[in-house]
Regions:
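Cationic-aromatic interfacial patches
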Residues: 24-98
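Zn2+-dependent peptidoglycan hydrolase active-site motif and core
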Residues: 177, 192-230, 255-257
């Protein structure tokens, strides 16, 4: 019998309300988004400016839009430097978060501690996923669509949240980097924003059926544990387009969608970029 136990310190309501609200201002840049661990922020500088965060250069779109993301365990502050027509330096204060502890029982043990003969496959698949996320797609139109706000790829109960420390069958494993939506196998998965498919694999060891959707400039969404894929690599999809169906493939104890997001090599929280989860539609009489 599969059992789930969730010991949680919830994300503060204030943190979620910060989504897409102005965060900070200086003489040259106003930031929007969520300036916290797992958050994504964006703003506009003079076109042609050079922007860095802690010395790492950021992409600057032709209209001056620039984006930065912060991982689960980001430091408490980061230095933003803008050089160009309107130079400035700004210290970004990054809000810390407390994360859930989630105990999951009943997972097949070979997906918790894989046998030696599985390790080569796991390594190969990690490289495949890494390559798909590392592709550089210079599409300002896709990124602008994403920054206008993501839609939920599936509507339903949230059964797992970003950042949780996962304990499988009593064994601590890596944190969970996505948000889980628990719905039956076959439930449609829709593109939360426009993008280009960079990975479409029906059976990866941990994530089962998996799609990666590139939203431009190394901002991407991943969709895990799918039962059926409706897209292929290289295909461009629009917001709301059917891309897959929910399943229980890979390391899963039941049917659900695991939606993840990455900016460069930082894993960010999709829930901070989406509106509150809508109520499921009432069944037809």
């Amino acid at each position: 019998m599969v059992r789930h136990f969730l010991l949680s310190v919830p994300i503060s309501v204030l943190a979620l309300l910060l989504n897409a609200m102005p965060l900070a201002a200086s003489d040259c840049i106003d930031l929007q988004g969520s300036l916290m661990q797992g958050g994504l922020v964006w703003g506009r500088v003079a076109p042609g400016s050079r922007v860095t965060v802690d010395g790492s250069p950021l992409d600057v779109l032709p209209d001056g839009t620039t984006v930065a993301g912060f991982g689960r365990d980001a430091a408490a502050s980061a230095e933003l430097l803008v050089e160009g027509e309107t130079p400035c330096r700004q210290t970004l204060q990054i809000q810390s978060r407390e994360y859930n502890i989630q105990r999951v029982e009943g997972v097949p043990q070979d997906t918790v501690t894989p046998p030696p003969e599985r390790l080569e496959r796991i390594k190969r698949e990690r490289q495949l996923v890494g390559s798909a996320k590392a592709r550089y797609l210079a599409r300002p139109d896709l990124l602008q669509d994403a920054l206008a706000g993501f839609a939920w790829p599936a509507i339903g109960p949230i059964s797992g949240v970003y950042g949780s420390q996962r304990i499988y069958n009593g064994t601590p494993r890596s944190p969970h980097y996505g948000v889980d939506v628990a719905m039956p196998t076959g439930t449609p998965v829709l593109a939360p924003s426009a993008g280009v498919v960079t990975l479409a694999e029906p059976d990866l060891f941990y994530s089962g059926g998996t799609i990666i959707l590139d939203h431009g400039f190394r901002l991407s969404s991943s969709f895990l544990h799918l039962s059926k894929l409706h897209v292929e690599v290289g295909q461009e999809v629009q917001r709301g387009e059917l891309i897959a169906e929910i399943g229980a493939s890979g390391r899963a104890t039941g049917a659900h969608l695991d939606w993840r997001m990455s900016w460069r090599n930082q894993r960010i929280d999709p829930q901070l970029l989406a509106p509150p989860m809508p109520e499921p539609a009432a069944p037809a009489p």
